[in-house]
């Protein structure tokens, strides 16, 4: 099992609802702890990670800031038909980063969509998303 969401593993951000030249969405998958994606201040916000092939997702970990409600969705092809696999309300962490973990059996996916439905402030940030799993053979 390894991190399927790293850009060096071939993962790509194929959609993000906001982008800033200083804090682009690709920062979430660059493997660095100090970089991040910043949202533009309206909700909902979302991003989609495309994996290099069909994968089995075992767990997802998100390091973020100011997120209140989040939804994780997957699909196994290039359609827009996503299936919700988790919804959660995060606790406010004041000035500390939020680290949230999600565990699954084996969830098959080609794409992972993360929908930030609301936040504790106008802006939120995602520092890192880790997707542990294996390629489907």
Label each region the model flagged.
Residues 1-52, 134-137:
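Disordered, acidic Ser/Thr/Pro-rich linker "stalks" and the adjacent N-terminal cap
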Residues 67-84:
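Short, surface-exposed beta-strand/strand-loop-strand elements in extracellular ectodomains
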Residues 53-55, 78-79:
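Short, charged/polar surface micro-motifs in flexible loops or helix N-caps
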Residues 83-103:
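Extracellular carbohydrate recognition and processing domains
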Residues 66, 118, 135:
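Flexible, active-site-proximal loop/turn residues at the rims of small-molecule/cofactor binding pockets
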Residues 14, 65, 89-92:
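Short, solvent-exposed aromatic-acidic interface loops
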Residues 55, 65-68:
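Short proline/glycine-enriched turn/loop motifs at strand-loop junctions of beta-rich domains
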Residues 32, 47-51, 57-62, 99-121, ...:
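Hydrophobic/aromatic beta-strand segments within beta-rich folds
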């Amino acid at each position: 099992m390894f991190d399927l969401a790293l850009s060096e593993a071939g993962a790509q951000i194929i959609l993000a609802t906001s982008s800033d030249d200083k804090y682009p969405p690709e920062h979430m998958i660059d493997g660095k702890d100090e970089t991040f994606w910043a949202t533009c201040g309206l909700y909902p916000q979302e991003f989609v990670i495309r994996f290099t092939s069909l994968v089995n997702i075992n767990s997802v970990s998100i390091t973020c800031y100011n997120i209140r409600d989040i939804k994780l969705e997957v699909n196994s092809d290039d359609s827009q038909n996503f299936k919700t696999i988790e919804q959660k309300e995060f606790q406010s962490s004041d000035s500390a980063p939020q680290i949230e973990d999600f565990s699954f059996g084996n969830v098959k996916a080609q794409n992972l969509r993360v929908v930030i439905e609301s936040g504790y402030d106008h802006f939120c940030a995602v520092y890192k998303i880790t997707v542990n799993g294996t390629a489907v053979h």
